[in-house]
């Protein structure tokens, strides 16, 4: 289940890339007085993120159902806490980070999203002592709203900071 249409753009960063960039900033005299963005250069839609998660886990890509955020909230969903659906952040207009300054001044080379996600998933598998998820709420949403899918729209243009 994706809130709204799932076309919201999101831009991630692999934690190892943040650490590497921070070390380069500390070691570079040229970095003094500058701010740098750490991010993957490619923004992804929510649909793409779910697809990449399925690939990283080596499972069949799930069928995605888009349900408007207000209906998820009316049914008892919450953007922060149990029954979390991507949080408020994921409904905002896309804000993407420009990383060319870090690339140019510090030779920043972000890890490919799929590569970083696969490595993160492997680590997750090593430490997954989490309880089995309860999908009762999702099943109820699908029964009530699952067929009401809005027509797909292209994502809004990102705002670069």
Each language-model region and where it sits:
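A contiguous, mid-protein "functional segment" used to position or interact
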Residues: 99-133
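Conserved loop-to-helix N-cap of the C-terminal "lid" that shapes the substrate pocket in Rossmann-like
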Residues: 6, 11-19, 35, 43-47, ...
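Mid/C-terminal beta-alpha module of Rossmann-like enzyme folds, strongest
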Residues: 24-87, 119, 128-161
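Short C-terminal domain-edge/linker segments immediately following a structured domain
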Residues: 2-8, 32-34, 66-70, 94-97, ...
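Acidic/polar helix N-cap motif
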Residues: 27, 98-99
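A conserved pocket-lining segment of Rossmann-fold NAD(P)-dependent short-chain dehydrogenase/reductase
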Residues: 1-13, 24-25, 30, 37
